[in-house]
């Protein structure tokens, strides 16, 4: 699935690309994009349709599900090789994707993706200047916090704090 985000970024930037087969071999890559002397890791999220449209038009709140981009803290040791930082992308999947998932296969919705949102990027310093967290930002209408499955650095694409600003690379 991540390769879809990679292709979208390559096409957007007008750079040629050759896809590597290190996914199946579980090999760690040396970065997904080498551009203007910098190396980037491209992160792609599969986002249910109802959230994807809000992500697309920028109306998603940071406390909503899929409102933040995440970089897992357990991969922090890889960050040093991504000299340009992280690029965040998203593809749309059906709202009922969990109900229709068949183990060991690729969903038709992913095979038939027609668009990818290039959300923005975060520099190394954006990641390292923040503390990782187990929790999503608090919803002001709810007393409970949503817990992630792992410790993460989180970024909201339009929080005005310089995180994943979506400006040119």
Name these PLM-found stretches.
Residues 1-34, 43-169:
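Nucleic-acid endonuclease domains
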